[in-house]
Amino acid sequence: MKPTPLLTGWTCRHLGDTAPGKPVTLPHDAMLAEPRTALSAGGTNTGWYEGHDYEYRRTLTVPENELADTHILEFEGVYHNAEVWLNGQKAAFRPYGYTNFYVDCAPYLHAGENELRVIARNADQPNSRWYSGAGIYRPVQLWTARGAHITLNGVKIRTLSLDPAVVEVRVKTTAPGTVRLTVDDLPAMQQESDGEAVFTLTLDNARLWTPETPNLYTCRVSFADDEVTETFGVRKVEWGTDGFLLNGKRYIIQGACIHHDNGLLGAVCDPDAVARKVRLLKENGYNAIRSAHNPCSKALLTECDRQGMLVMDEYIDHWYIHKTEHDYVDYFNDWWRQDLTDMVEKDYNHPCVVLYSTGNEVSETAQKRGIALTKEMTNFLHGLDDSRPVTCGVNIFFNFLSSIGFGVYSDEKAKKEAERAEKAKQRGEKAAKKKAVGSQFFNNLAGLLGDEFMKRGATLHGCDVKTRDAFANMDIAGYNYGIYRYKHDLKKYPQRLILGSETFCNDAYKFRELAKQEPRLVGDFVWAGMDYLGEVMVGSWEYADYAETFDGGPGWVSAGSGRIDLTGKPLGEALYTRVALEADNGPYIAVCPVNHTGDRHSPSAWKMTNAMPSWSWTDCEERKANVEVYARAARVELVLNGHTVGSKTLKNDCLARFSIPYERGTLEAVSYDAADHEIGRCKLQSAGGTTRLTLDAEEPTVKPGHLCYIRLRYTDENGITKPLARGSIQVQVRGGTLVGLGSACPFNKHSYLDSETDTYYGEALAIVRMGDGDAMTIAASDGEYSAELTVPAQA
């Protein structure tokens, strides 16, 4: 079938508005343009954005001679409770906001202009534990075919064996006929189809797909007048007591959890933003992504195939127990089979997908009904695709608490949360007075007590009792924050495979060292790889000069828990995990904000450090500087302006901490092996006295219509960032469109759709969509600094 993108020609308005809708281009996040107020029922979960229902409209023109053709609309993601109307008739309803779905248009079309209307609901707050976005936030396309054709998702490709490489291609057609197939490096072949044709291909000296060598093949299938092109990778996944095997060799999954938003763009699923996210995560040492806590986009799978990134595609955040009052629970029982079917259809041909997850922190797994459901969902996925293992992220401690009446999640708590939000809204009550419940309460408690609270709690005997039956009903046991159980449970359950489905950053080194010894410890996913909107303050160490309050109230917008911040900048924690996971041996230096040494900050268990790679702390001479060095070494030495100021032996971690008086100049870290030979060196240089505004584009040229990321920084004359320089920056764009502007600060009162932003530790980010030619970005700051940058259009 032939796809036609339907990205332009749309309007959007609040449902019920009488004024004409505003023109929008898909993908579109309607929620990002809403005000953020203390009366928002989504509250801390959604970053205080208000929730509304939306109506999208466009015209669909069908010529008379094409009316008898097959017409199928595909929506890759509409949040949520989507209704599709054609010519005044309801053609489809899909409640889940994160799955792609299809609409057969045949019963509703007529020749000429057809009215396509899509309703997306998001006024039913709270309905999510994080920023969901709203509207048609992923692409839409119209699939058409004339006469007999290959069915949608009708080409399925699977690697059967590796030596030699044998690949199976199954093709489903709507009628009998001849199916023709070509694959790179092989002669063309054909078969007769009676509705399905099965090809078995042998590829001599096949180029295997791995994260290190993401080789892809192209498969072209033709039938009648229809043609389908699919890419695939030759790779095989196996799992057992030898661990997780990729192409017959043990492979340690070293992953990061991510949410679906794209930072300053909100939930907009732009292919360029997705490609950038994958690139940044890979550059910082991760080889896998957990799509938390919903099926990922097609764009993400395409990029993970291309760049070499493993994917654990996760279905949902809850089953039949509410986490928020208006979440998906009311639809779950009727829809989970269709949802999983569509997730597998989307994932099947992608070599990057190596795991399916049925859910996240579903305390239902502590109950008899939930244990049976675990098995049912695992078996259902095996029936759709038995080439990939199935897991589920279980918070071991939460399961135990729920079994003794202290559950983090319950229908009653979700209802109370919604009632409190509604009463607060009616009274105009400030957010600070709203009582934290559910996961927010436990996140706050963990923030005060530290990560040990969660990890030690998971060692209680009852945690084993309330998880073992569910773990027996999945291929790989998913442990959320259960690292202190690994050794014990691997010994007690000799057939169990364990995946750290959600972990703290400071456990990366311990995980890596244990995984090298224990094959049945198959992997780890840190929370979180990249910062995200909503679930505010959960991972933030913020100070009073950037955050007006520490209560998570309005103004707070992001979690602050990413190893990479909201603008895509790797933090000290990213440098630590690079070394801990042995992406390289370092050394790296990061420094906690010297101007805040000893100051109180907002609490969080999901933050290991707020250190950053900078030695430019203006007016902080002689203040104590807390310096961190990350290295795989026997010893590290710290040198300031040519003088050794500290030396430490590294034991049981790849992190050494030093406290030294701040002094401008050159700070160096030198790493040594066990024989005291130098094996690595890095340095940070203080910025000079001159301050200027500097604009840097991430790419030297950008294709027309694509995104260009431009970092705005206060620097010295040599381009060294000055983190304590702070101001407001106004941005204009010529030859393009400013589509996002902001900083990484988790507390931010500006809209990311504004043309002005405050800086955060000397930096901000502008996202520009290129026009037809070169694009010029002009920035001015407080009447004192200005700069401009022209990015050439790529031919």
Kindly give the residue locations of the regions a language model identified.
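Beta-strand-rich binding/interaction modules
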Residues: A165-Q191, A197-F199, A625-T644, T666-S671, ...
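Extended acidic/polar, glycine-enriched regions
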Residues: H110-A111, R170-W239, R657, P661-G665, ...
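Active-site-adjacent substrate/metal-binding segments within catalytic domains
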Residues: P35-V62, E66-F75, Y79-L86, A92-P95, ...
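Edge beta-strands of extracellular beta-sandwich domains
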Residues: E227-F232, D676-G688, Y785-Q794
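Accessory beta-strand-rich segments of carbohydrate-active enzymes
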Residues: K2-G16, A30, T46, G51-T151, ...
